[in-house]
Amino acid sequence: MYALKNYLLSMQSHWMINQPLYEAVQQSMPMIARYTGREGLERLETTPAAKMAKELFPGIYRVPLFRRQFCKLMIEEIGHMVEEIPFQPNDSEDTLRQIPEIVLREHSPELYRNMWFVVNTVINPIIISLFQRECRDIASVQIANYNLAEKKQGAWHHDESADISVVVPLNTGGYKGGGTEFHRHGVLK
């Protein structure tokens, strides 16, 4: 089991969340509570959290989730992590779709619990705001290493274990290539 080196990453709180987004989620909670209390029989009004999401392609949104400082700390922590835990491809996926990853539930339960906290308290309200569906049962939280030196490209796929996927680039602008391409829509870098 990997022990986190940076104490801040072990704190279950919202310090790492982009503050305007966090405030928008908090302001959205009464609206979401009314909507869910009425069992979704009435329309959910546009929440402040939904207003923070920018629709880039139909049904595909960008949200300013984490603070830059958190992303920097995570990248540093991943540097320590790979000294003890190598990135491994998922053997249950076919070769074209295998990206080296570290599954947090298996290797860093403490960090997994903190990401679970973020899913429940921040991401889930955003998903309810955008899609009027809850997404509390997360299938996996992993750190993927999209490295052009080791893998020139991935292949089209659907995440079999999820109806909704959340991709969080930690080092935006700190690499060449990369990004996430959405079939018949375009590439997000």
Map each language-model feature to its residues.
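Short low-complexity stretches enriched in small and charged residues
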Residues: 19-21, 29, 93-98, 119-126, ...
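Short, functionally important structural connectors and interaction interfaces within domains
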Residues: 17, 24, 57-58, 62, ...
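Alpha-helical interaction segments
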Residues: 5, 102, 106, 136, ...
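FAD-dinucleotide binding site
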Residues: 19-20, 47-48, 55, 64-65, ...
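Non-heme Fe(II)/2-oxoglutarate
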Residues: 37-133
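Fe(II)/2-oxoglutarate
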Residues: 1-58
